[in-house]
UniProtKB/Swiss-Prot annotation:
One of its GO terms (molecular function) is quinate dehydrogenase (quinone) activity. It is found in: Cell membrane. Belongs to the bacterial PQQ dehydrogenase family. The lineage of its organism: Bacteria, Pseudomonadati, Pseudomonadota, Gammaproteobacteria, Lysobacterales. PANTHER family: QUINOPROTEIN ALCOHOL DEHYDROGENASE (CYTOCHROME C), QUINOPROTEIN GLUCOSE DEHYDROGENASE. Pathway: Aromatic compound metabolism; 3,4-dihydroxybenzoate biosynthesis; 3-dehydroquinate from D-quinate (PQQ route): step 1/1. Disulfide bonds: none annotated. It comes from Xanthomonas campestris pv. juglandis (Xanthomonas arboricola pv. juglandis). It comes from the Bacteria. Keywords: Cell membrane, Membrane, Oxidoreductase, PQQ, Quinate metabolism, Transmembrane, Transmembrane helix. One of its GO terms (biological process) is 3,4-dihydroxybenzoate biosynthetic process. This is Probable quinate dehydrogenase (quinone). It catalyses: L-quinate + a quinone = 3-dehydroquinate + a quinol. The chain crosses the membrane at residues 22-42, 48-68, 77-94, 106-126. One of its GO terms (cellular component) is outer membrane-bounded periplasmic space.
C-alpha cells in the first residue's frame, strides 16, 4: 500500500512537472510504482516485476541525469532502492501466493540492494569535495625577523590579509586543545531571531591584551594568556534591529607613522598626543546608533581629545536618519592618522528616501572630516547648516582597507536605495554602485573607481573588505593589487594604482524584465579570468531533495519560475536569483597566503525567489503592512516606488535549499594558475536539519558559511562560521580537514591568532555567540593552543 501511495504522489506531481515542460521521469515512475503497488497488494508477482523494471530504468535515468555526483544520486536513488529491497524480499511470498516456486535469488538481490543502500548511507558521512586537492606546497618556516607580533587590525593587516606569519601550530601538529583565555563570558548573550543581535566579532590583539566588542558596542579587554577581564567600557548602544559589532580599530601614538613610498602621495598628517595623556593607545568603534567612539586601550576611559568625550555624532549632516535607518556594524578603519567610517543602511528595500552613503575620515583634534559624498563627489566639505549630504546614495557597509605606501583607502561600495528598483537612479548612482573605490586617505580625493555590477537590481553590493596582495604575473613579477569577492560569486583582481583588472573581465549580454522605466544594463561583467565560486547556471537536473519526493517538488517550483542565469532581472512574475543576495561570498572576506600566492574563500549557496508587486494591487497593500526593517526576506514595501517586493529563500518543503549540495564550501585559489586548487564542503547537519530539528549526525554536506577565515604560515586555514558548532583547521595545501574543536554554541565570528609574550604559546581565538538562525546562544570567547608537553 505504501508503494502504491508513493506512486500516486509521483504520478500527480510528475503530471504537473511534465505540464511545465519538465522531466517525464516522475510521471512514468509514478505510473509504474502505483501499478506495482496495486499488483503487490493483490499478491501478484507481476507487481514485483513491474517495480524491478522501473527501478532498473531509474538507475539508468539517474546516471544520465546526475552523472556520478554523490549527493544528486542519493536524492534520486535512495528511496527507490529502499523500496526495491522490500519488493525483493516480498518476491518469494508473492510467488507462494500463486503456488509458484520461490527460489532464493530474490534474497540475494535484496542483500545486494541493501548493501548498496548501506554504502550510500555510509557515503553520507565522508566529504565529497567539488574539487579534490593534490599535494600542494610544503610549509615555509617563518623567518625569525618576520614573526607576527600583533593582530591590530580587523583583517590582521590594514590590507586585510587575514594571514598570520606564525607556525607553532602547524599542519603536522595542528590539533590544539581549548584553554585560556576561555571560555570567557563577557556577559551579553546575543539572543536573536535572525534580525536582532548577532555576535559576528573578529577580536583584536595587541601585546598582552585581546580586545572585544559586543553586539551593543560594549568594549572589553582581556589578558591575552589567561582570559582575565582587564577592563570593560559600557556603551550600550541600541537600535530596533540588526545589533552587531564586527570589529574595532586601533591606533598607537608611540608607533612610527608609515611613510608613503609611491610617487606623489599626499602626506599622512602628523598627530601629537602628550606623554602621560590618556589615549596614547586608543580603540575605535562604530556603533549601531550612529556614533564613532574612541577609548583608551589601556584603561577603557573615553578619549577626551577626540570629539565630545571621545564620541562623534556620525548622523550630523545626514538629514532625517531615524532608527534604524542609519547604523554602523563594521569596524572603523585607521588609515594613518585618519579614522574612516562608512555606514550600514537599514534594509534598502524599505523606501527610496534614506540617509546618504557619505564616507568620512575624522582627524584627531580638533575633529574635522574629509569625506566623499557619492551624490556630490567634488565637494568634500560637510554640508552647511540646514542642508545635508545627498540622500539615498551608495553606501559602504563592509570593512575597508588601507595601503600606507599609497596613503590610499579602498572602499567596497553598496548600492543606492532601493536595491531592486533602479528606475530613478542618477548618473552618479550608476557610477559608484557596487564598485571598489580608491580614495586619498588624507584628503578624501577620488583616485579611481571600478564597478562590478551595472545598475545592480539583485542586492549584489560589495560585501567584504578588499584584500591587498602582490599578484603574480606570468613572467614571475608581482603587481600590487586589490582582490575582492562578491555576492555574485565573482573574484576581481585590480591593479592597486589604476583600478584596472589584472585578469580578464568579460561584459556579457543580459536580459531585462518588465518593470516600467527600469534602466536595464545591456551587459554585466563576469570575472572569467579568475574562478567563479558557486555560480553554476542551474537547470532542472540541479534540483535536489532529501528524498525523490521533495526533489520533485523543487523541480516543479523551479519550472514555475523565470530563471535566466546569474543576472536574472526581477519582474512582476516570480524569478530566481542564484546565488542570491546572501551570497556567494559575504562579509567574512578572503584570507591570503602571500608566501605561496593563494587566497582562501568561503561561500554560501542559497537561491532567492523574487517577485515585484505593482503598488496598485491588493498584494502590494499586504506587502506594505509593517514588515520589520532589515529582515530582507518576505514582503517589503519599497516605499516611494510603484512596487512592493516579495522574496525568500528557495527551499524545499523540508526547509532545505532546493539545489544540490554543497551549500557552503571553502576554496583555495591559486593565483599563479588562476584556478581552484581545492574546494571542500564545510559544515555538517549535526546541529541543524529539516524544520530546524537537529539531526545529531556529522554528515559533511557543506552548510552555508557566515564568518571569516584565518590562514597561517603553519599551513592551516581556520574557519568556524558554519551551522554546526565547531572551529575547524584545514590543510592549506590539500583542503583536508585536520582538526575540529567543539564549541558550546555556533560562531559567526572570525578567528585570530597570536603568540603570547608571557607564555610563548600560540593561541587561536574565536568568539562564539551562536550560529545564524540557531536558537542556541551564548557569549563565549575561546582560545585554543597546543597541549603542554608532559
Amino acid at each position: 500500500m505504501l508503494i502504491a501511495l508513493v506512486g500516486l504522489i509521483f504520478l500527480l506531481g510528475g503530471a504537473r512537472l511534465a505540464s511545465l515542460g519538465g522531466s517525464w521521469y516522475f510521471l512514468l515512475m509514478g505510473l509504474a510504482t502505483a501499478l506495482a503497488g496495486v499488483l503487490i497488494v493483490l499478491r501478484r508477482p507481476a507487481g514485483a516485476l513491474v517495480y524491478g523494471v522501473a527501478f532498473a530504468l531509474t538507475l539508468v535515468w539517474a546516471l544520465w541525469d546526475a552523472g556520478l555526483e554523490f549527493w544528486p544520486l542519493v536524492s534520486r536513488l535512495m528511496l527507490p532502492a529502499a523500496f526495491a529491497v522490500l519488493v525483493a524480499l516480498a518476491w518469494p511470498a508473492l510467488r507462494r501466493s500463486r503456488a509458484l516456486p520461490t527460489g532464493r535469488t530474490a534474497y540475494g538481490v535484496a542483500t545486494v540492494l541493501a548493501l548498496a543502500v548501506v554504502a550510500g548511507i555510509g557515503g553520507m558521512f565522508v566529504p565529497h569535495p567539488p574539487v579534490a586537492g593534490n599535494a600542494g606546497p610544503g610549509m615555509t618556516a617563518v623567518p625569525p625577523g618576520s614573526v607576527q607580533q600583533n593582530w591590530s587590525a580587523y583583517g590582521n593587516t590594514d590590507g586585510g590579509s587575514r594571514f598570520a606569519a606564525l607556525d607553532q601550530i602547524n599542519r603536522s601538529n595542528g590539533r590544539p586543545a581549548a584553554g585560556s583565555p576561555g571560555p570567557t563570558t563577557p556577559g551579553e548573550i546575543a539572543n536573536s531571531d535572525g534580525n536582532g543581535a548577532e555576535d559576528q566579532l573578529t577580536p583584536l590583539q595587541v601585546g598582552e591584551k585581546v580586545f572585544l566588542c559586543t553586539p551593543h558596542n560594549n568594549l572589553i579587554a582581556l589578558d591575552a594568556s589567561t582570559g582575565k577581564q582587564l577592563w570593560r567600557r559600557e556603551i550600550n548602544a541600541t537600535s530596533s534591529v540588526w545589533q552587531r559589532c564586527r570589529g574595532l580599530g586601533y591606533f598607537d601614538a608611540d608607533a612610527a607613522l608609515p611613510a608613503p613610498s609611491v610617487a606623489n602621495p599626499s602626506p599622512i598628517a602628523a598627530v601629537t598626543v602628550a606623554q602621560g595623556a590618556n589615549c596614547r593607545r586608543r580603540l575605535f568603534t562604530n556603533t549601531i546608533d550612529g556614533r564613532l567612539i574612541a577609548v583608551d586601550a589601556d584603561t577603557g576611559a573615553f578619549c577626551q581629545g577626540f570629539g565630545s568625550n571621545g564620541q562623534v555624532d556620525l548622523k550630523a549632516g545626514l538629514g532625517a536618519a531615524p532608527d534604524p535607518f542609519y547604523q554602523l556594524t563594521s569596524p572603523p578603519l585607521v588609515a594613518g592618522t585618519t579614522v574612516v567610517g562608512g555606514r550600514t543602511r537599514a534594509d534598502d528595500n524599505v523606501q527610496t528616501d534614506m540617509p546618504g552613503g557619505v564616507v568620512r575620515g575624522s582627524m584627531w583634534s580638533p575633529v574635522r572630516s574629509a569625506g566623499l559624498d557619492p551624490g556630490n563627489p567634488h565637494d568634500r566639505q560637510a554640508p552647511a547648516a540646514g542642508s545635508s549630504y545627498v540622500r539615498s546614495t551608495p553606501n559602504v557597509w563592509a570593512p575597508m582597507s588601507y595601503d600606507a605606501a599609497m596613503n590610499t583607502v579602498f572602499l567596497p561600495l553598496g548600492g543606492p536605495s532601493t536595491d531592486l528598483y533602479g528606475a530613478e537612479r542618477t548618473a552618479l548612482d550608476h557610477r559608484y554602485g557596487a564598485s571598489v573605490l580608491a580614495l586619498d586617505a588624507t584628503t578624501g580625493a577620488e583616485k579611481w573607481v571600478y564597478q562590478t555590477v551595472h545598475n545592480d537590481l539583485w542586492d549584489f553590493d560589495l560585501p567584504m573588505q578588499p584584500s591587498l596582495i602582490d599578484f603574480p604575473n606570468q613572467d614571475g613579477s608581482h603587481t600590487p593589487a586589490v582582490v575582492i569577492g562578491t555576492k555574485a560569486g565573482q573574484i576581481y583582481v585590480l591593479d592597486r594604482a589604476t583600478g584596472k583588472p589584472l585578469t580578464e573581465v568579460r561584459e556579457v549580454p543580459v536580459k531585462g524584465s518588465d518593470i516600467a522605466h527600469e534602466q536595464y544594463a545591456p551587459t554585466q561583467p563576469l570575472s572569467v579570468g579568475m574562478p567563479q565560486i558557486g555560480t553554476k547556471h542551474l537547470t532542472e537536473s540541479d534540483m535536489w531533495g532529501a528524498t525523490a519526493m521533495d526533489q520533485m517538488l523543487c523541480r516543479i517550483a523551479f519550472k514555475q519560475m523565470r530563471y535566466e542565469g546569474l543576472y536574472t532581472a526581477p519582474g512582476t512574475d516570480v524569478s530566481l536569483s542564484f546565488p542570491g543576495s546572501l551570497g556567494g561570498m559575504n562579509w567574512g572576506g578572503l584570507s591570503t597566503d602571500p608566501v605561496h600566492d593563494v587566497v582562501f574563500a568561503n561561500d554560501m549557496r542559497l537561491g532567492l525567489w523574487v517577485q515585484m508587486i505593482p503598488a496598485d494591487t491588493r498584494k502590494a497593500e499586504a506587502a506594505g503592512g509593517g514588515e520589520a526593517v532589515n529582515t530582507g526576506m518576505g514582503a517589503v514595501p519599497l516605499k516611494g516606488t510603484p512596487y512592493a517586493v516579495n522574496k525568500n529563500r528557495f527551499l524545499s518543503a523540508l526547509g532545505i535549499p532546493c539545489q544540490a549540495p554543497p551549500y557552503g564550501t571553502l576554496s583555495a585559489i591559486d593565483l599563479k594558475t588562476r584556478s581552484i586548487a581545492w574546494q571542500v564542503p564545510v559544515g555538517t547537519v549535526q546541529d541543524t536539519g529539516p524544520f530546524g530539528i537537529k539531526m545529531h549526525l556529522p554528515i559533511p554536506i557543506g552548510m552555508p558559511t557566515l564568518g571569516g577565515t584565518l590562514s597561517t604560515q603553519g599551513g592551516l586555514v581556520f574557519i568556524a562560521g558554519t551551522q554546526d558548532y565547531y572551529l575547524r583547521a584545514f590543510d592549506s595545501a590539500t583542503g583536508k580537514e585536520l582538526w575540529k574543536g567543539r564549541l558550546p554554541v555556533g560562531s559567526q565570528g572570525g578567528p585570530i591568532t597570536y603568540v603570547s609574550h608571557k607564555t610563548g604559546k600560540q593561541y587561536v581565538v574565536i568568539s562564539a555567540g551562536g550560529a545564524r538562525q540557531s536558537p542556541d546562544r551564548g557569549d563565549y570567547v575561546i582560545a585554543y593552543s597546543l597541549p603542554d608537553a608532559h
